[in-house]
Design a protein with these regions (language model features):
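Glycine-rich phosphate/pyrophosphate-handling loop used in enzymes and phosphotransfer proteins
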Residues: 1-202, 207-237
């Protein structure tokens, strides 16, 4: 199928979803439950990375020689015009929390199936800038964390990691700029409870790893027992 036809179909289904929210975001079929965002057929077609089963997977390699991360993984591949991109757009720009709940549920399934994630004491969502929070009304990573816990992962939620100021997004900087900027990207508050605890940092999409690297540097002040990372998606470049 030509790319332009796929693009037209994608925009058409997104348009329908604005007015008929109980249809599948991908194929447009009726959904059986109001909490769904994808039908069972489209959910079954999600592109899993299976990074959790790989030694030295691409996400782990992002942090080699930079920050101590015991284990890192991403659940799905993120590419343009994909189901995963639609889910992220729905969550971040259309305020569709059901998309975040789905992404969190899928991560919870992966955590239960993979002992490399254990133990987990705290889930730590990557915070967003204050202006984005005001505009969006919520932090998408927090929605994913809440869904992970709601789907059976016994961990506490820590929200003491804060964005320090409204800086340019990390993706607009080169690696050297990101590294020099990382120490001022986050503030950490009320962190005494994290000492010797096992932390799982959670975000929606990982591209370069720079933002999570900065979070790890800030969290190191708390002297945690271990730090692990999971994201809903990994940008395939």
């Amino acid at each position: 199928m030509p790319n332009w036809i796929q693009s037209v179909q994608s925009y058409f289904h997104a348009f329908l979803h604005l007015f008929y929210p109980h249809i599948c975001l991908q194929c447009g079929t009726d959904l059986l439950a109001q909490h769904q965002v994808l039908c069972s057929n489209c959910e079954a077609q999600l592109p899993y990375t299976h990074f959790g089963n790989m030694q030295n997977n691409p996400v782990e390699k992002m942090f080699w020689g930079r920050v101590p991360v015991q284990f890192a993984s991403a659940n799905l591949f993120f590419t343009k015009e994909s189901i995963v991109q639609k889910l992220i757009i729905e969550l971040k720009y259309h305020q569709n929390k059901k998309a975040g709940m789905l992404l969190g549920r899928l991560i919870a399934i992966e955590i239960k199936a993979n002992p490399k994630f254990q133990p987990i004491d705290y889930l730590i969502p990557i915070p967003i800038r204050k202006n984005k929070l005001r505009k969006r009304g919520f932090n998408q990573s927090l929605i994913i964390c809440e869904s992970i816990i709601a789907n059976g992962i016994d961990a506490c939620l820590f929200t003491g990691l804060k964005k320090s100021k409204n800086t340019l997004t990390q993706t607009h900087k080169d690696r050297l700029q990101r590294s020099s900027h990382s120490n001022t990207l986050f503030n950490l508050t009320d962190f005494k409870e994290l000492k010797n605890k096992h932390l799982l940092i959670v975000d929606d999409v990982i591209t370069t790893g720079a933002t999570i690297e900065a979070a790890c540097l800030s969290l190191s002040i708390a002297q945690p027992g271990s730090v692990k990372v999971v994201t809903a998606a990994y940008t395939l470049r």
